[in-house]
């Protein structure tokens, strides 16, 4: 009986997640960023706020953990901190990314050094979350407001900034929503168990990628030269090497006769194909 209940909950969760993901995909607004400008490390202005792309040496100088944690208000969404929200009696399914930004910015003694690296000309973390009625709207909406400068950052503009930073660092938080209370509690319990099983040892995000690239015969940069690479250029190299290796493997398999590639799309054989289709 207990196993049946577990299987039923698993099925319920899977169905809810599938529906939520489908809805998120349907409703998600696509932001158009110039991939070539990102590759060359050009600055971007959104709503007048300058966004600077860090180089590898910037992250090294600051410290990788400090860098990524310092950007967590922008990199995280409600799913990322749902246990914390649930413990505070807040339903993560009803929280927007702009609210997550505001919540994490209010953590005492939070280090904003990484924010200064990405936003050198403006302290975006000083903005306050408010419901504001905009001139072109009949209803109020969530915005970030800078009282000193009388500057309003609309939620759509904040989402565009967040998506750009996430794309720049190649970090996209998962989105997991649920409807019923039982399913939500099940997901929270699962998160708690996963957290308990994790060790306190810090793991590097960049080290495995740097090591793989430097030791790959097709990577043209030496270790010390890698310091000068922009983070977008580096992430592009990581993905391009993966595409190159998979294309070579498919090509070798097709010529060997031991692999049926008749149903493999021809584009998969092209290592110069678009990475973000």
Where are the language model's segments positioned?
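An amphipathic, hydrophobic-aromatic interaction surface with interspersed Lys/Arg
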Residues: 1-93, 98, 166-253
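Intrinsic-disorder/low-complexity coil detector
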Residues: 34, 53, 72, 107, ...
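Hydrophobic, aromatic-lined core segments that form the binding pocket/scaffold
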Residues: 99-203
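Long, intrinsically disordered, low-complexity Ser/Thr/Pro-rich regulatory/activation regions
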Residues: 254-277
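A general marker of short, structured functional hotspots
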Residues: 27, 154, 160, 251, ...
């Amino acid at each position: 009986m207990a196993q049946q209940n577990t299987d039923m909950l698993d099925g319920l969760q899977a169905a809810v997640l599938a529906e939520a993901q489908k809805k998120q995909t349907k409703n998600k607004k696509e932001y158009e960023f110039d991939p070539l400008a990102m590759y060359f490390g050009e600055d971007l202005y959104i709503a007048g706020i300058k966004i600077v792309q860090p180089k590898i040496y910037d992250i090294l100088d600051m410290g990788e953990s400090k860098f990524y944690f310092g950007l967590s208000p922008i990199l995280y969404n409600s799913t990322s901190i749902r246990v914390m929200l649930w413990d505070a009696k807040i339903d993560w399914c009803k929280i927007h990314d702009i609210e997550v930004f505001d919540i994490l910015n209010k953590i005492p003694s939070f280090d904003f050094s990484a924010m200064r690296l990405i936003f050198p000309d403006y302290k975006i973390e000083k903005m306050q979350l408010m419901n504001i009625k905009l001139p072109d709207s009949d209803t109020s909406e969530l915005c970030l407001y800078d009282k000193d400068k009388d500057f309003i950052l609309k939620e759509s503009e904040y989402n565009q900034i967040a998506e750009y930073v996430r794309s720049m660092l190649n970090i996209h938080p998962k989105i997991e929503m649920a409807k019923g209370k039982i399913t939500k509690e099940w997901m929270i319990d699962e998160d708690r168990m996963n957290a308990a099983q994790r060790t306190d040892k810090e793991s590097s995000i960049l080290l495995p990628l740097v090591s793989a690239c430097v030791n790959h015969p097709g990577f043209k940069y030496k270790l010390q030269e890698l310091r000068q690479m922009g983070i977008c250029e580096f992430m592009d190299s990581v993905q391009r090497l993966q595409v190159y290796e998979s294309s070579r493997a498919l090509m070798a398999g097709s010529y060997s006769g031991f692999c049926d590639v008749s149903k493999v799309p021809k584009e998969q054989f092209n290592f110069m194909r678009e990475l973000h289709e």
